[in-house]
Amino acid sequence: MNNAIRARVAEIPADFLKQVRTEGRDALGQQVKRVIAEGGEPCRDVLRRANKGEELTLASFSPFQKPGPYHEYGPVFVLANESTETIDRTAVPAGEDGNYLQQRFAIRAYSENEEILDAALVEPDAAQETVDRFFARTDTAFLHVRFPSYGCFACRLDRS
């Protein structure tokens, strides 16, 4: 795992995954979109890129729990069916083609009240330093990593 970000990676909520897979509804109650992977789509539930031909679900998701100005919804890809893959929740692979985060991505720091404190657009080789700097702030409760081109939520990082 070249340039892996070391932090505790939060799982996407099981109730969200169950809802999109069994009911076909996303976090906003909208019908999800089923797609066949072209290959390379970021699969949020398994923290890897999709393989060509895999069945995926595209659904609206919010990584926030509290109401407020930063509570937003956005698209995420998840595998259409439950996976038995083992997922490393202690690091996120970044940097090389095929890795979940690949190249440049955004990291945002949030308070306990889910208000944004800081943000940075980083290359994989600077990611760990940015994560460490954001977590050095005592008011940082968690971080979000996002794909900058489409703005999609990649993952939530908590203190190890």
Predicted regions and their residues:
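Short, hydrophobic/π-rich interface segment
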Residues: 103-142, 146, 159
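Short Gly/Ser/Thr- and Asp/Glu-enriched loop/turn motifs at secondary-structure junctions
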Residues: 147-152
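Extended boundary segments
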Residues: 1-21
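C-terminal edge-of-domain segments
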Residues: 153-160
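Conserved mixed alpha/beta catalytic, RNA-binding, or beta-rich assembly cores of soluble enzyme
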Residues: 20-120, 124
